[in-house]
From Swiss-Prot:
It comes from Rattus norvegicus. It comes from the Eukaryota. This is POU domain, class 4, transcription factor 1. The gene is Pou4f1. GO terms for biological process: cell migration in hindbrain; cellular response to cytokine stimulus; cellular response to estradiol stimulus; central nervous system neuron differentiation; habenula development; heart development; innervation; intrinsic apoptotic signaling pathway by p53 class mediator. SUPFAM superfamilies: Homeodomain-like, lambda repressor-like DNA-binding domains.
Amino acid sequence: MMSMNSKQPHFAMHPTLPEHKYPSLHSSSEAIRRACLPTPPLQSNLFASLDETLLARAEALAAVDIAVSQGKSHPFKPDATYHTMNSVPCTSTSTVPLAHHHHHHHHHQALEPGDLLDHISSPSLALMAGAGGAGAAGGGGAPTRPRGAGGPGGGGGPGGGGPGVAGRRRGPGGGGGGPGGGLLGXSAHPHPHMHGXGHLSHPAAAAAMNMPSGLPHPGLVAAAAHHGAAAAAAAAAAGQVAAASAAAAVVGAAGLASICDSDTDPRELEAFAERFKQRRIKLGVTQADVGSALANLKIPGVGSLSQSTICRFESLTLSHNNMIALKPILQAWLEEAEGAQREKMNKPELFNGGEKKRKRTSIAAPEKRSLEAYFAVQPRPSSEKIAAIAEKLDLKKNVVRVWFCNQRQKQKRMKFSATY
């Protein structure tokens, strides 16, 4: 029985021609034309190689018949033991754009007849379906198959059973073929300088591509599992970090939301507007004075406001966003005004002659209703009663006394107008 490992006669399949920088750009017809040029040392050798091709085909078919009749197959060997069987010339037809190497012109050893014809018709091919195709390894497949396709015969030869894949396409029914079969593509090229930066992402994967497709090496499987576990652990750690970051972001957002809710609560805004109005009245400051005094706070982006804006804030007729924006500004002014008022009360005045005209006093509605109730009971209260009312309503005694005087004058005018 003829083995694929046996030494076969050395055939010079085609003359050694200088390859171009980009051989994949030249068509097969151009290659045939160059092969048939009338060069004196090569012209006589061309037809001799064709005769040798036919003889090799006959020998290969005979080997297939012997293998089928005996029904035996060689023990499976890794692809690395048949390194010299796959030594095809290294051209730049690889799928990864690498630097242009100096081509090593190896003579083709133990190539099948279909591969020889295909190589003569298209010399720009570098990687063909030699072992996964037809002939001695294919188990009765057609000897001439288009490039990049597996042989139709299934696994009859030695080491068969893997998918005959060449280049980037899969054959219609391709068997695994002979000892050098399996995956034959750009990544399984025997020359080490072709394994560049883009073929495979991991050495274990690259070694798995060089193995026959039927049975991967256990060491490669273990290496791939180890690196897969490491990648899974790294992904889990990254997921934990991302989850922690997301949790921190959620906690921070919740804290900001709780802070902002206290400022944007409508009930809180309403209570502040009422407190601001009462304290402004106690200070004896008008709404127009508040609006003009805001420019003195030196707050960036804040100038003087109109009296109508302060009035709308106190009556809660501003928009919600404007109320939120105006609240800290008015609160800052109120604290500064009350601080100035306390300092003024603590300092004794040197003389009262230079005092300006007293401003008009405004009384809030609740206090006004209480005063009207006291006036209905006693229009002319005593000095002690006026002091008690002022202390109860948190007003000045003079303000309460003047209000009672004004209210009596108002009632007198109303009676006079009703009589006449």
